[in-house]
Curated annotation (Swiss-Prot):
Belongs to the DnaA family. One of its GO terms (molecular function) is ATP binding. Signal peptide: none annotated. Plays an essential role in the initiation and regulation of chromosomal replication. ATP-DnaA binds to the origin of replication (oriC) to initiate formation of the DNA replication initiation complex once per cell cycle. Binds the DnaA box (a 9 base pair repeat at the origin) and separates the double-stranded (ds)DNA. Forms a right-handed helical filament on oriC DNA; dsDNA binds to the exterior of the filament while single-stranded (ss)DNA is stabiized in the filament's interior. SMART domains: AAA, Bac_DnaA_C. GO terms for cellular component: cytoplasm; plasma membrane. This is Chromosomal replication initiator protein DnaA. Domain I is involved in oligomerization and binding regulators, domain II is flexibile and of varying length in different bacteria, domain III forms the AAA+ region, while domain IV binds dsDNA. Residues 1-71 are annotated as: Domain I, interacts with DnaA modulators. Residues 100-318 are annotated as: Domain III, AAA+ region. ATP binds at G143, G145, K146, T147. It comes from Leptospira biflexa serovar Patoc (strain Patoc 1 / ATCC 23582 / Paris). It holds the Pfam family Bac_DnaA_C.
Length: 441
């Protein structure tokens, strides 16, 4: 079958604003098709992630329009191919191909309010004086813009000084890369890994709370890398979903994070949610009055991911039906179907449930989310998992990320607590008391 990529690009261009088509779709390169999958290559991890998040459906629809058959779309970067990983690469000062920066995440489109202004100011200060606030540690719940700030720092530093080498990486990628290197059982491969990371002027490290998911050597390697960069006044920026003292990492590593600047990003307040909605609606030409934006902002949870989800739903509706059918009543209907089926629970986030369990069981948050097997901590931990899953409908995989553990451990914890409730009435009573408070908040 002939995959006519140029025609597919033309079809996609009809559906996406020119600015975004130029930045994210045009750079994609057709690689091959096999087994009903179209394989594309992206020039960077940032572009790959953005396309997978926002535009994969547009590409699959365009393939169907041109080819007349349904294909899945797979996107890889060159760095994800094994042949690239096995090379001994020490990047040139002029080569930022492995920076993994998303070019769309910049300071100018980061919307601020009281909930994130300190973190935003700290991020800009790092750009103005790299190495002065070292490390910069950003923390806050999921979906509040930590990753956006990391990329903004990197993009602005590269803009000011193209000679600087910048690397954005999350803990999962770092873990996988390190484990892959170690398994080569080759001293040269390990040295190449170390030299490459030591060569960066700026390291942007996301989701550090998951660094404990690998072998002991992974934390040791990161500790050595941190010290190497820190001693040479190279800028390090770290992001996490919790304060540094709550990280499930070695104390000697956590102690290094308090030397610099720590900035808390809180859940989005009402005005920030309105501003984000307005910006996203404008991007996709979705009509909305100020009253409608206020109505939506009041009902959405305090992070950007739920917000992006509803925008995606509206974009698909607008594409499938006529533009004029997307009335304010229809927007409300779509929003309620996706997010607002249980209005009594609006605003109750996983963080609030965790805090409530800590309060009712007199267990510190760091102990509830930690790895300790003390008898005082295990039942409250399992109670929290059950509440998150059964009452807030949080997926088990996400609960695993919250507790820095595996999907199977979450299942085991939930099952254990259900068994406990059958024989220990006080835990059953506490479960129903907290469930009632959440359900009728």
């Amino acid at each position: 079958m002939d995959i006519r990529w140029e025609e597919i690009l033309e079809e996609i261009s009809k559906q996406i604003p020119p600015k975004y088509f130029s930045n994210f779709i045009a750079p994609l390169r057709f690689d091959k098709w096999e087994n009903q999958v179209v394989h594309l290559m992206a020039p960077s991890g940032g572009i790959k992630r953005h396309v997978e998040t926002k535009y994969i459906g547009f590409i699959e629809d365009a393939v169907y329009q041109v080819v007349g058959d349904r294909f899945k779309v797979s996107i890889l970067t060159e760095s994800e191919t094994s042949s690239h990983v096995l090379k001994e690469v020490i990047q040139s000062k002029f080569d930022d191909s492995d920076s993994d920066l998303n070019p769309e995440y910049i300071f100018s489109n980061y919307i601020t309010s009281d909930s994130n202004r300190i973190a935003f100011t700290a991020a800009k200060s790092v750009v103005e004086q790299p190495g002065k606030y070292n490390p910069l540690y950003l923390f806050g719940p999921v979906g509040v813009g930590k990753t956006h700030l990391l990329h903004s720092i990197g993009n602005e530093i590269k803009k000011k000084d193209p000679w600087k080498t910048v690397r954005y990486v999350n803990s999962t990628s770092f873990l996988n890369e390190f484990i892959f290197t170690v398994r080569q059982n080759n001293r040269e491969s390990l040295e190449s890994f170390k030299i490459r990371y030591q060569s960066y002027n700026v390291l942007l490290f996301d989701d550090i709370q998951f660094l404990n998911g690998g072998a002991e050597k992974t934390q040791e390697e990161f500790f050595a890398l941190f010290n190497f960069l820190y001693d040479r006044k190279r800028q390090i920026v770290i992001a996490s979903d919790r304060p540094s003292y709550e990280l499930p990492l070695h104390d000697r590593l956590k102690s290094r994070f308090v030397h610099g600047l720590q900035a808390d990003i809180k859940s989005h307040d009402l005005e920030l949610r309105k501003s984000l909605l307005k910006s996203n609606f404008s991007e996709f030409n979705i009509p909305a009055s100020d009253n409608l934006l206020h109505w939506l902002a009041e009902r959405l949870e305090g992070d950007s991911r739920a917000l992006i989800g509803i925008v995606n739903d509206l974009v698909m509706y607008k594409k499938a039906y006529e533009y004029f059918l997307l009335t304010e009543d229809k927007i409300k209907e779509i929003a309620e179907a996706r997010f607002l089926t249980n209005k009594k629970r609006i605003g109750f986030s996983p963080d609030m449930v965790i805090d409530l369990v800590c309060e009712r069981t007199n267990v510190a948050r760091k102990d509830l989310l930690g790895k300790s097997r003390k008898a005082d901590f295990i039942p409250p931990r399992h109670l929290c998992m059950l509440l998150l899953h059964d009452v807030l409908n949080v997926p088990k995989a996400q609960i695993g990320r919250i507790f820095s553990t595996t999907h199977s451990t979450v299942i085991h914890g939930i099952d254990k607590f259900k068994e406990r409730m059958k024989s220990e009435a006080q835990w059953e009573d506490l479960f129903h008391t907290i469930k009632h408070k959440i359900s009728f908040q």
